[in-house]
């Protein structure tokens, strides 16, 4: 059953169930893009700047990018775009897709390094509360390790990565979300049962990945995912963001 976490429901009950994460909970596993920070718009900008750099007359609007986000992974997103734009693979072989994506990653990292992002409301406080209460922290994402490291270092400083007991990225596994691979790898490394973890996600693909791994999911809808179907989520955060109290953390 889905439990709603929102400003007017925190501490209340929903059909007899409290709207806080039930103990035992030993680990909180975060997605990155859209969850820790509203970075998807920065990704879109980096894609478009990459296309312009290579002389391609492609422009990914917000509406188009919202559709493309249903496909996990940047390289996979480009391939999906090519297929649906009717561009034959012999005209745009996979080697070019890899080159494009590598340049886009470099551009995205430079944008992050220039400070053009903020953590989403409540993220910093939730992480601090989890640390105070002895929870393990981990990351399960389809983005690249370079992107993760840059964002964490920019938000928390050079030692920020040390807060996370495990970080699993899309290139570390065979299948990206909605497959459960990143989550299965995280809980394997943590040595903690899936039922003793909580995943924080912003998208339906992320929710499906965590649920397929047997992990309860709390959703924080983001700019590009507010219209997603989250009917399988265990909890949904409200407008105040990732409130630690909503997860039962003092």
Predicted segments with their positions:
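Asp-based, Mg2+/Mn2+-dependent phosphohydrolase catalytic module
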Residues: 2-17, 21-25, 128, 144-146, ...
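N-terminal helical cap/lid subdomain that shapes the substrate entry/recognition surface
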Residues: 21-32, 36-121, 128-133
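Conserved phosphate-coupling serine/threonine residues in phosphotransfer and NTP-handling enzymes
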Residues: 35, 141-143
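Residues at secondary-structure transition points
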Residues: 91-95, 99, 114-121, 142, ...
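A structural preference for short, pocket-lining loop segments at secondary-structure junctions
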Residues: 135-137
